[in-house]
Regions:
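A secondary-structure capping/hinge motif
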Residues: 125-131
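Alpha-helical bundle regulatory/interaction domains
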Residues: 1-102, 106-108, 113-118, 132, ...
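Short, basic, alpha-helical segments at the C-terminal edge of helix-turn-helix-like DNA-binding modules
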Residues: 137-147
């Protein structure tokens, strides 16, 4: 499992406020390779291409969390309307296939379905998601295993592990 990246802004009234994007979500806002953000804390000051000073000031003026959420949503939607950069369709399709298979799908079968060679596929996937296809599949598989453990009443952990794709 990996740690998540944090996008952080500091003002007098806000100590930390975070936004979590779906895979390929942040790549719609920036051309930066997302693997550079994995396991790191990123300040809004380092993302001047997306977040300007007016955003930080307006966010700091809000007293309630719901108002801050509204400001973030409005700002990101307005930015997206002006600067939309669609994620690579091959990568988006591969992410959907991994999610649908709950991480059990092999990287080879993903490459065959998206019609890319291994090196190019892995490079694009890592650029748009921050992870290699194998790393992302492992994360999805682990999340599925946790969900199975939470919802399954069976005392047999081996069966649960096999159902989650660990064999």
């Amino acid at each position: 499992m990996t740690k998540y990246s944090e996008l952080v802004t500091y003002t007098e009234s806000i100590h930390m406020f975070g936004v979590r994007f779906l895979p390929c979500g942040l790549s719609c806002f920036t051309n930066l390779p997302l693997h550079e953000f994995v396991n790191s804390r990123v300040s809004t000051n380092e993302m001047k291409a997306v977040f300007d000073d007016t955003f930080i000031e307006k966010l700091g003026e809000q007293k309630h969390v719901t108002d801050r959420i509204r400001v973030v949503e409005e700002y990101l939607l307005a930015y997206l309307a002006r600067h939309y950069q669609p994620a690579d369709s091959h990568v988006a399709m591969a992410v959907n296939m991994i999610n649908h298979s709950k991480g059990k799908r092999s990287v080879r079968s993903l490459m065959d379905d998206v019609c890319l060679c291994q090196r190019h596929f892995e490079r694009k996937f890592k650029h748009y998601t921050g992870f290699t296809p194998k790393e992302y599949s492992r994360i999805v598989k682990f999340k599925n295993a946790v969900e199975l453990l939470r919802t399954t009443t069976s005392a047999n952990l081996l069966t649960t592990a096999v159902d989650a794709g660990y064999y």
